[in-house]
Amino acid sequence: MDIDKNRRIGLTDEQVKQSREQHGKNVLTPPLRTSLWKLYLDKYRDPIIQILLVAAFVSLILAFIEKNFMETIGIFVAVFLATTVGFYFERDAAKKFNLLTALSEEQPVKVRRNGKVMEIPRHDVVVGDIVLVEVGDEVPADGELIVCNDLQINESALTGEPVAEKSLEGGGDGAYPRNVILRSTMVMNGRGEFVVTAVGDATEIGKVAKKSTEQTSVETPLHMQLDKLAKMISKVGSVVSVAAFFIFLIHDILTNPAWGGKDYFYMAEIVLKYFMMAVTLIVMAVPEGLPMAITLSLALNMRRMLKSNNLVRKLHACETMGAVTVICTDKTGTLTQNKMQVSALELKQGDEALLDTAIALNSTAELNDGKPIGNPTESALLLWLDAQGKDYEELRKQVNVLKQLPFSTERKMMATLAEVDGETYLFVKGAPEIVMKKCIIEDRMLRQSAEELDEWQHKAMRTLAFAYKKIEVSIMRTSRTSTAEVVALLDANDLQLQAIAAIADPIRPDVPAAVQECRHAGIEVKVVTGDTAATALEIGKQIGVFEDEPENIGADGSLTSLDQQMITGEQWEALSDEEAYERAKDIRVMSRARPTDKQRLVAMLQKRGEVVAVTGDGTNDAPALHYAHVGLSLGSGTSVAKEASDMTLLDDSFKSIANAVMWGRSLYRNLQRFLFFQLVVNVAALLLVLGGSVIGTEMPLTVTQILWVNLIMDTFAALALASLPPSHEVMKDKPRKASDFIINKSIGFGILFCGIVFFLVMFALLVYCERRGKGGVDVHELTMFFTTFVMIQFWNLFNAKALMSHHTAFRHFLKDKGMILVLVLVLVGQWIIVTFGGEMFRTTPLSLHEWLLIIGSTSVVLWAGELWRTFKRMIAKRR
């Protein structure tokens, strides 16, 4: 295709078709989506689910022998519910994200085709198209410039360079030639036209996107914990059941004379009976409700976090945020407002009205309903005028511009010759070191201005100087004034210093407090930015990642020098892997960082056992976002960054990260509470089955009753405990180690203590009923026994709610609507089962007196827990 011939008219419809066939559409190929059936089957990789499936198939075989399929059906239902809930919520989040991605591809783009300028969707741009861009546009594809008028591009999304000057000539000291324009960069100033040379995956951003979707094998902390728990449960359950099988079988052989005969069918029945008991023990040891509790907790958190501006794309990210020990954050947009503002402006000579005019004229930026369009620095000056109640558009209308000399990197200043109230002025704006050399300044003013500028620059602010002079020559009052004449006026070096200004991208107001909250929670915050060392240092000081003192506390508690906490990308790259491994823990700020530097830092921190979260908004952040345990993209970030992330901060705020940590930690605590409740039920029920076999009675809890206790009630408990709101108290704790077992010593002790006590109470009741009755335990007594067991767990749900706190179980009780609903459901469900269960549940109706007696006597479980928590509160106060 002869591009030169198409510059004026653009491509024809036929050429567009040919180009699309040859080079493809202008769409970035999304990461290979897992098919729905594979996504669903992935849920069966959960180790707890796998144990349940084994138990279900063993139970199925026994069900054909025993002709009782209720238990088998119950286990399969538990598996189906747990896997389907998780699959549904992840699929729902993926759909929402795909919709956002699709909408971004519909952005209108101006192109020249068939000799006309028209707007087409971004995905329709093809190689060879002539694309027109101006201030505020996002570049839709890679290309080479053919028209360039003061074009400045924000390449920070790809190269980290905030403002890159473009020209028709190649070369330059940037990452790409100056005549090359790249997809997903933003036009900050000027206008231009370019020929598209690459679309879709062939663009530079497409190449980065491909790298960001490389598969990594970092296991999440929760998955490791569940794997460990599943192995422990399977070992304990297997050992206990096998031991019980042989103990009871040997006891029967030694005491039952039938073993001396030849009734082999009867002996096989005895073996089958004990084998059934062993399998029942294994099934009871496995917490069927745990996968449901986890998926419900994650799904509820996912929905709630969306309301607090966190769009969670992957369920595991909810919990993993609670285990985070390091947050690597970029600066622009996350810590700062990504909005330049005038921090200080000192008038030196002339009046304010003349300065207002100078600011309005020496700018190519615009404000659209208060929203800045164009160069960020010039936009900041217009916003400053607006804040002073001055209308820059009116100021521009009141003057007659004779000649304007645009800003260039060579001149480092901009000049405008204009007629104001019948007088001609030359207004100049630019770098202070350049502008002040062209001024006549008194020594005192020069020293004072130099000191102020130096102070601002050390605070990582961008500085500007304004100067002017009154022109007496009448010939200058024509529109034919040449550039050379304006340059000659500047070279006279007789300007008057009008003002100096400091412009900064201010820190978000809530960031310092959010950073401190994270640090108090034991989470190290590291700033990784492409800015200069001085700017990065100042940002670090402002948000509080380190203090102003020469010595600071390092990540391991040791004193670390400020130099040790600062590093540049170049210095980081020069370190060997061993040196980088040692240095990683103390780095607080990395300046002049490139994407590979950020990714290497994440890898080194993970190697040290840290759980790492990474924030980023640019395409250059995508690889690090993907490699981290949790990738946090910004709502205003590029589509590639969002695609690589696990969670999107819709409000771009670092405060949302602190909230996500709180949600994650609260979720983990709720899971621990559920485990405590569930395993107490399982331990007590398991011991009861063993105990019932010892005294020779039939199983005190039937299969259907066990299903109610173990499955339905546990699902209710999962709902109750998963729906507990997050607590700020968790932010006072240090991060847990990824290697720490989810059941710590105190929880483990509580499970065994409560489980054994509940068993002893229930076993004593069983023995009492056995010995009191002449013909064994009747159905009425077994109904009382069953209801007592359920009510003990009912009251223990309150203790689970208050687990790992000194507070009463009734704290914020009326706000816990999910808990209240579940308590009502358990009571109503138990009454229905007892009253109408009949032969299916082996129950008979109880009188009101019996109900009140059971409810009142079992409430001791709650009051004992309240006394223990009161005692702990008293001890804590004394300390």
Where do the model's predicted regions map?
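Alpha-helical transmembrane segments of multi-pass integral membrane proteins
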Residues: 749-765, 791
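Transmembrane alpha-helix entry/boundary detector in multi-pass membrane proteins
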Residues: 778-782
